[in-house]
Amino acid sequence: AASKYINVVPEIEMPGHALAALAAYPELSCDSTQTYKVSPTWGVFEQVFCPSETTFKFFEGVMDEVIELFPSEYIHIGGDECPKTAWKNSAFCQQLIRQLGLKDDTTPSKIDGIKHSKEDKLQSYFVTRMEKYLNSKGKNIIGWDEILEGGLAPNATVMSWRGVEGGMNAAKAGHNAIMTPNPYVYLDYYQEEPEIAPTTIGGYNTLKKTYSYNPVPDDADELAKKHIIGIQGNIWREYMQTSER
C-alpha cells in the first residue's frame, strides 16, 4: 500500500457493534452472566462494551497490536450505533456516571443543538479514554459522527455518515471532519431502479447524484472550510456475496 501512496486506516469498533467480541470475552460486557452469541445477520444490537477498566485494558492491548501492524497516523475507533440500554440498566455504569458527575443536558449542546443524556456523555468518556491512550502512542482517532453526542474528544476527527450536519458541526467547532454522507456517497445503495438491480441494503444513489456532491458547501465559513479535510465513499458488504458484486 505504501508503495502506491495508500494509507490504510484500521477501524476497531467500540463501544457498540460488540456482539462477536462479547461472545468470546463476556467479561467485557455489563452483564458477564449473560450468554452472548455471534449474530448470523447484520444489525444494531443492545449488547455493547462496558466502560470498565477491564474493557479499557483489553482495548489498550488490542491497540498496541494494531499500532504494530499499521503505520497510519490515524486509527478509527467507530463510535456509531451504540444503544445505551445496557448502560442504563447497569449498576456499574450508573455508579460510574455519578462518580464522573455526568448529568442529562437541560439545554441543547452548543455543537449540535441537541440535549444529550448522561449515557451519551458516558460514551464521550469512553472515546476520550481511548483517545488519550492512542495520543500517547503518537496516533490520532477518527470516529463516526455519533461521537459528537455527549461532547467531542479534544483531538478527534469526525467522519460524517448520517448526512452532512455532523461533519459541519464538528468543522465549525474547530475539529477536522471527513464527509461521507449516506445520501450521496454510500456506494452500496441502489444505483438504478430496484426492480432491475441486484438486492442491496436500500437507498438510491445514482452516479449523477454521487458526483454532484460538494463536500465543502458554498456557504461554509472559513473555519469550517479549513477543517473539512476529505471525503470518503463507503461500501458495506451485507449484500455483496461475491467478488464480482
Please identify what each model-predicted range represents.
Residues N140-A156, W161-R245:
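Flexible, acidic glycine-rich loops studded with aromatic residues
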Residues A1-K137:
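Substrate-binding cleft of carbohydrate-active enzyme catalytic domains
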